[in-house]
Amino acid sequence: MTILVLGINHKTATVALREKVAFSEEKRLSALNQIEQLKLAQSTVILSTCNRTEVYLHNKFIQPEQNSAWIDECVAWFAAIHQIQLTDLQDCLYFYQNQQAVTHLMRVACGLDSLILGEPQILGQVKQAYQLAEEYYQRAHGLGKSAVISSELSRLFQKTFSTAKRVRTETNIGESAVSVAYAACSLGRQIFESLQELTILLVGAGETIELAARHLLRHGVKKLMIANRTRARAEALVAKLESPFIEILSLSELQDGLNQADIVISSTGSPTTLISYEMMKQAQIQRRYRPVLIVDIAVPRDVEESIVKLDSVYHYTVDDLQNIINHNLSEREKASEQAEEIIAEECAAFFEWLKVRQASNLIRTYRESADEIRQELLEKAQFSLSQGESADKILDEFSTKLMNKLLHSPTLVMQTMVKQGDSRGLQNFLSVIKK
């Protein structure tokens, strides 16, 4: 088996270069077609995310002496399809083969190679990449589901999916918050029994607020307010979130939002504070001092620190969240060690399956070859008999030729073992013959 993965990721390349080598769906289909036409691989899966672009190629016909040239061809194709000079890729492009490639794919799918350790989204992206490749081969060849990606590459990806599921089940790799937005939402779940009946106020409309909104909506929040200086940006964010449970406020309406909110998460670029002690005091009077969580992620801060003096106000800053994140990252690091052990086990299991498959293929090929020899000699013998030749003579010739032809390949193998000094192989061969 020859599986090659080549690619770049957030560790090896800048955002600018990663953008250049990204595959749109249309470009991905074109790439799969090119690889097939150039005979670079029998089957290919292309993974393209904001943090990585990787091409997984399977070519079972590559011989050891052809390997280096094949890799060069694949790299040249990768540069050509993205219209990039090879020199621009030299320090950024990595490639792995066979066992290293299998381990790498499993690490990627389990989130061990991600920007955020253990992030779960990558598994869905790997599954989607595999599904797109399957659909391409089905359409390209006009065949049913039985004739798609090569069995080796298919088995590898199926094994990878089950490995990722096992890692999620048996370790805590995805349990703890390791992003500021997620940590803020996790605090809310710790302080309040349920988020579903709470009113949430988000101040700002940037990436962190978007992530926080997605987390909250995923946990069933039914009333979400977004306050932002520029209404157009808030509207654009609401359009992306596609939820009917969001209300937009202007900053002049911020006090109204505070009067209702059980959780406030603020992340703006304002040079001055937006939420003062007096505003929170008024809000708490309106709220009859029900508990409120204020998470100030902004730098400089959006919320006056003195609000901690108010009753039932839980106030956290970005530094507090960073401490939580650092602790959680430490926990994920421990879980990642367990995940690596699981990956090593599953990788070994995949190669054990591959050995059995290759042995079965070898045996089947040898038996088919032997049957072809038998059929050829049998036809000749039958023709000789029909011509009235001696049956004893024909049977003797048939059996002698059959023996010589069938023993030719094993004899060559034994001669090679002798030349290579493979005494163990010869001993195993001899023990089988004696049986």
Curated annotation (Swiss-Prot):
It is an enzyme of class 1 (oxidoreductase). PROSITE patterns: GLUTR. One of its GO terms (biological process) is protoporphyrinogen IX biosynthetic process from glutamate. Keywords: NADP, Oxidoreductase, Porphyrin biosynthesis. It catalyses: (S)-4-amino-5-oxopentanoate + tRNA(Glu) + NADP(+) = L-glutamyl-tRNA(Glu) + NADPH + H(+). Transmembrane segments: none annotated. One of its GO terms (molecular function) is NADP binding. It comes from the Bacteria. The record marks 104 as: Important for activity. InterPro entries: 4pyrrol_synth_GluRdtase, 4pyrrol_synth_GluRdtase_dimer, 4pyrrol_synth_GluRdtase_N, GluRdtase_CS, GluRdtase_dimer_dom_sf, GluRdtase_N_sf, NAD(P)-bd_dom_sf, Shikm_DH/Glu-tRNA_Rdtase. NADP(+) binds at residues 204-209. Signal peptide: none annotated. Substrate binds at residues 49-52, 114, 119-121, 125. Belongs to the glutamyl-tRNA reductase family. Homodimer. During catalysis, the active site Cys acts as a nucleophile attacking the alpha-carbonyl group of tRNA-bound glutamate with the formation of a thioester intermediate between enzyme and glutamate, and the concomitant release of tRNA(Glu). The thioester intermediate is finally reduced by direct hydride transfer from NADPH, to form the product GSA. Catalyzes the NADPH-dependent reduction of glutamyl-tRNA(Glu) to glutamate 1-semialdehyde (GSA). Possesses an unusual extended V-shaped dimeric structure with each monomer consisting of three distinct domains arranged along a curved 'spinal' alpha-helix. The N-terminal catalytic domain specifically recognizes the glutamate moiety of the substrate. The second domain is the NADPH-binding domain, and the third C-terminal domain is responsible for dimerization. This is Glutamyl-tRNA reductase. The lineage of its organism: Bacteria, Pseudomonadati, Pseudomonadota, Gammaproteobacteria, Pasteurellales.
